């Protein structure tokens, strides 16, 4: 579970909710496009770890995918099932889902989760757990904010200065290095590939979001794939 969010922060005072929503929907479309193009699986069993209120059904739609939503807060998992956004709910924390048997999923999804986990401890247990839970040929899918993007770098500076709550409302938004995450996935026995989801930022005016977002089509290009504001890691267990 992430830390308590403080709505009275600098960035939210300056941001228009409609602007935030526009980029959120644009980002979801881009996530869906990337996963459809690169996952290489048409359906199966999927686990959304740290599902929160949005377990990622837009990425893993019915009827092709059976989606299990797991969260340390059981109410969030129940909410996902009640809304039809998941087929089953499970209480449990990332890296501690020992109740689930080995090789029981084709996809393990961490959507905007690992950068919160990184605040509390190392990511290696989550990656090792993903490999254990995956069937041969299955994939860990992680979508995270990027330390190498200017916004991520600025956020990291604010966090180091102890200003995270004042600036963006929570201390546990920890932008991740895509290179380090890919290396950690490889060390866990997975085969990683990486794509930039979007170069844009939800706090920008909508017109600027569109202009910067035009670069997203280059998000799988060598070199540029490392520099998105958010990135997608697809890390496969060998078949």
Short names for language-model regions:
Residues 164-180:
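Acceptor-substrate binding/catalytic loop of class I
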Residues 110-114:
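A short beta-strand submotif of the Rossmann-like class I SAM-dependent methyltransferase core
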Residues 124-136:
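A short glycine-rich, Lys/Arg-flanked "PGG" loop and its adjoining helix->strand segment in the class I
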Residues 1-41, 141-163:
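Conserved class I S-adenosyl-L-methionine
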Residues 95-108:
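A short acidic, Gly/Pro-enriched loop at the edge of an enzyme's catalytic core
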Residues 47-48, 52-97:
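Class I SAM-dependent methyltransferase SAM/SAH-binding core
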Residues 159, 192-239:
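A C-terminal cap/extension of S-adenosyl-L-methionine-dependent methyltransferases
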